[in-house]
Amino acid sequence: RVIVTSDGEIDDECSIVRFLLYANEWDIEAIVTSSSQYHWQGHKWAGDDWLEPYLAAYAQVYLNLAKHDPAFPTPEFLKARTALGNVKSEGDMKEETAGSQLIVKVLLDESDDRPIWLQAWGGPNTIARALKSIEEKHPEKMAAVAKKMRLFFIWEQDDTYQKYIRPRWGKFNIPTIISDQFVAFAYHWEKILPNQSHPVLRGDWMNRNILKDHGPLCSLYKAHDDGRFRSEGDSPAFMHAIPTGLRSVESPDWGGWGGRLLAQTEPARLQVSS
């Protein structure tokens, strides 16, 4: 089960294409637009509705995807689980929003006690706002909610984890991953990835195999103008949750598609990139 929060940066837009193409791998509980220290309403903002073209393109290719696996969620299912979160400023968590309320609804649902991976592709502020609402309105349920939660942050792109989540929820020892290994899959990949990986990220390969004549969803993928891979810095957040047989979800220090993590002694159950 996954909940995605994203600030709509251009590499988030690349990651959302891959996320939708892999949507059969998890139960998607919510896709929420959030903010970060880099992007919020009025500052390098992609727009409150930046997800709409991607969901529309997914609807166009859904029937073809479903031929390969009926587990792909319907476009209507995804649309009903997409909402605008806290986006007014960096670290915004002052008010409840449709996005934070959607997260609250999922976390308080007692009909399903399976773990939920809450991913912050931008700042974790909308997640923080949801948790604050639960603390204020349902304090007796905090322990049960925390037991289901797993956190995966691509960096800490605002201060709400340190200022709210960790101080108020840290006592529950929620498994938490803060990753900086995304750099291998981000803007400076040409300097970081080994040379043998470069051919499938070059423009000729990308144009031939992804960008051109591969349907409306792939056509939205924001590579460089010449077709070169740009960045998917947020993809490790969901790649970690893909069941590859490596059991990295159970033990992140074993390593998986989202990276290999190193356990910290303080706070307990925090994992950082190794």
Q: Where in the sequence are the language-model features?
A:
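N-terminal acidic, glycine/proline-rich low-complexity segments
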Residues: 1-274
